[in-house]
Amino acid sequence: MIYSTTETIPGKEITEIVGVVTGNVVQAKHIGRDIMAGLKSIVGGEIRGYTEMLTEARDLAIQRLVASANEKGADAVVGIRFTTSAIMDGSSEIMAFGTAVKLKK
């Protein structure tokens, strides 16, 4: 499965738009990460625990987006974008969305 943030895929011709596909993950904070985040907010610097958590969540959202495209019989997903939103105190949602398409064989 080809997936891209661009609207086209170089060297490939889109023959059909299958539809919008999404993949999302709701991730909750871990108390241990919160303690480290509190310390980092005082002294500054990257909060690696959160960076790793969000990277894992983004990767899982992409996997779910690709699975959705496969279920619809798509060859690729173009125009992928990401959104992040707070769901409740201590958790957030990462959503990946794009357009599933069929390519000329």
Swiss-Prot record:
What are the leading ranks of the lineage?
Answer: Bacteria, Pseudomonadati, Pseudomonadota, Gammaproteobacteria, Alteromonadales
Q: What is this protein called?
A: UPF0145 protein Ping_0381
Recorded family membership:
Belongs to the UPF0145 family.
Which SUPFAM superfamilies does the UniProt record give? YbjQ-like (SSF117782)
Superkingdom in the source lineage: Bacteria
Matching Pfam families: YbjQ_1
Question: Organism source for this protein?
Answer: Psychromonas ingrahamii (strain DSM 17664 / CCUG 51855 / 37)
